[in-house]
Amino acid sequence: MSQPVQAQSFQQAPTKVLVIDDSNTIRRSAEMYLRQAGYEVILAEDGFDALSKIADHQPRLIFVDIMMPRLDGYQTCALIKQNPKLKATPVIMLSSKDGVFDRARGRLAGSDRYLTKPFTKEGLIAAVNEYVGPSSIAS
């Protein structure tokens, strides 16, 4: 007697999210919140570090701090959006500045959204869900 063929279950890989911030505290907070929600998190300390990690990991969403040494968030965002392969990748600016000028400058650089620090877990996850949807894998 033959055994019935069982359907194989394929586990979908978690959505990759890149967090770029020169503050270790901010990176670790974002990492904790996002991992708890089931996302794979890649961390970068500055724009230069981020550009190589973007090529290696191809994240579906990028959070970038505005105020960073060497290559700031505006410059990093502009470089990401100028790349035809990355242009559609959502970029969310992170900043403790909440002025109209800062938001406008972020838009001019190509950002999709602006999130003010300190952020909450709910605010961070809502921003991710808006662009890539909820994670299919819950931790």
Which sequence ranges carry the predicted segments?
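Short hydrophobic/Thr-rich beta-strand motif most characteristic of the beta2 strand and flanking loop
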Residues: 38-45, 53
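Active-site beta3 strand of CheY-like receiver
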Residues: 57-63
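Charged docking surfaces used in two-component/phosphorelay signaling
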Residues: 28-36
